UniProtKB/Swiss-Prot annotation:
Family listed: Belongs to the small GTPase superfamily. Rab family.
Binding site for GTP: 12-19, 72-79
Primary localization: cytoplasm
This protein's name: Intraflagellar transport protein 22
Source organism of the structure: Trypanosoma brucei brucei (strain 927/4 GUTat10.1)
Length: 219
């Protein structure tokens, strides 16, 4: 296999910079403008990411050179909530985006976490909603779309709600102080691919073991 498809959702409140982040990660940065355009209800952009063979070993490294990433930029309005389960289906990763200049906006990410990271149609053995997308396959972007006035320095990333504290959070911006979120995005894709290939390899090994045991069972 020469490539693989990865589906990553970009979620968060309206006017948080999701489309700007999506365009940048897809290699199509916007022309600077102060005019707001609502995403209604969804955009899907694709980008190819080169994969680092040195991060994989054995069968995992064979032939896989790139991943095709679909970035699903989901509108921040809840008026399309009825369609969210369909959007969430088969998601591999999530990027949560919020504006730290808006007080309490990080708490709004809980709505997106509960509706997309959790599968509310299935329960686990402890009677909790099953995880659709794990924390390790997610990122949080504290995104500055304009010159930061309040959220700077140690306050750039406010404390996350308890349910989101296991997700890596970064300070992001295209024009102001920012962590290297493109590098974090590439690493996220690598992690998703590595987890997928490890699961496929384990499944193949299990089938090989079962095939070896089958003649013994017949005797």
């Amino acid at each position: 296999m020469s490539d693989d498809l990865v589906k990553i959702l970009v979620l968060g409140p309206s006017k948080s910079g999701k489309s700007t982040v999506t365009n940048f990660l897809a290699g199509t940065r916007d022309t600077p403008t102060k005019e707001y355009h609502e995403t209604n209800p969804l955009r899907v952009l694709e980008v190819e990411i080169a994969l680092d063979d040195t991060r994989r070993s054995g069968r995992q490294a064979a032939g896989l050179k790139k991943a095709v990433v679909q970035l699903w930029d989901v509108g921040g309005s809840s008026k399309h909530q009825a369609g969210w389960p369909a959007i969430a289906s088969n998601a591999d990763g999530i990027i949560y985006v919020f504006n730290p200049e808006v007080k309490g906006s990080e708490k709004e990410l809980l709505l997106w976490y509960k509706n997309f990271a959790l599968n509310q149609d299935e329960l686990d053995d402890d009677n909790n909603f099953k995880m659709r997308v794990t924390d390790g396959h997610s990122l949080i972007f504290s995104h500055h779309s304009s010159l930061p006035e309040f959220a700077v320095g140690d306050n750039a990333i406010p404390p996350m709600p308890k349910q989101l504290q296991g997700i890596r959070a970064l300070e992001t911006s295209l024009d102001y102080q920012s962590d290297n979120f493109k590098e974090a995005f590439d690493a996220l894709v690598e992690q998703i691919i590595a987890s997928r290939l490890a699961a496929e390899e384990n499944d193949l090994l299990q089938k090989e073991r079962e095939a070896k045991d089958y003649p013994r069972l017949k005797r």
